[in-house]
């Protein structure tokens, strides 16, 4: 296959050349199916595993349509996390660089005033998180948000998350400023086809529009994870999980490996980051309590391999494109099996081999069984590191490092900033209701 196949899908010549320059020459299944239908003007619901090229599946037809009349605000992409928004914006900018495309990023943690200025310049594409865009809709003037009333495309990336109650209020606010649904194309993409997403595909046809195109890439043998992914578990006592983690990361097999450690709580991420750093592991972290610039820097450090270990909450489980991750550790087991799939999807990408290791305590047995049922695969027991090695080599110094980390966090008031911000938000909500 050659880049002419993207041309046969209907992509503009300039875009085909841009993709070719980036060594993107063979369309994936989701791209082959969705690009032509979107170019026909159909709404689209696309489902495919993580790493399957969903961004190009919606970006390519949007850019092709935009280039036919490159004026004003043309499309909005909503996504649940800041990091995903920045990554999508990078891709749009790269694909459209030859056409002087203007892309605005509208996410939390950045200057609201600067974002308003960018929106006033009428960027061609807006990549946003729902909360921050909703803020502009409610509070910024007509000169800032007026262009949103004429957009041609709305994309919900990671639609299964955006359609949950967490985002419902902000999402409704964002949509309220847009043209009616029969005057715009609506594209939903997800790695998990939830009931909410499927319900939209079964909704009555919008008058004056062709029927919604729905496409889901079927998983081989009903397994929702790559065939090149090795899944293992390790039974670990809760109180010594840090010691086991350190022993694995510094073992001969993994001492040079690129690794993401997933945890369920921000405080756990911070404890592990500090503990491992004091033990001379090149580590960084990514969680919601970090200022946006720190979050951005952290992802960049990990991508550049300045840090080989990333400690993350599920902020990093969706869509982040980090080329080579050799090991994913579920330090905490997620309650939702689909979350495990998204975490595991950070490794074994593009046909490469990868490993996923679950730390399993007594309370996690049912969660692991639910994951195995979901992926239709039994995990193998991890045997590379045993109890004796942990006790002999790691336990004492890791325990001391953790104690120092906890003392430092207590002294710095870690978590107080979040409580303060929560009180501020609650105060704003009360003021908003009164007005």
Curated annotation (Swiss-Prot):
Compartment(s) of residence: Nucleus, Nucleolus
InterPro entries given in the database record: DEAD/DEAH_box_helicase_dom, DEAD_box_RNA_helicase, Helicase_ATP-bd, Helicase_C-like, P-loop_NTPase, RNA_helicase_DEAD_Q_motif
Residue span of motif Q motif: 4-32
Cystine pairs: none
Principal subcellular localization: nucleus
PANTHER family associated with the record: ATP-DEPENDENT RNA HELICASE, ATP-DEPENDENT RNA HELICASE RHLE-RELATED
Protein purpose: ATP-binding RNA helicase involved in 40S ribosomal subunit biogenesis and is required for the normal formation of 18S rRNAs through pre-rRNA processing at A0, A1 and A2 sites. Required for vegetative growth.
UniProt free text on domains: The Q motif is unique to and characteristic of the DEAD box family of RNA helicases and controls ATP binding and hydrolysis.
Protein name: ATP-dependent RNA helicase DBP8
Source organism of this protein record: Kluyveromyces lactis (strain ATCC 8585 / CBS 2359 / DSM 70799 / NBRC 1267 / NRRL Y-1140 / WM37) (Yeast)
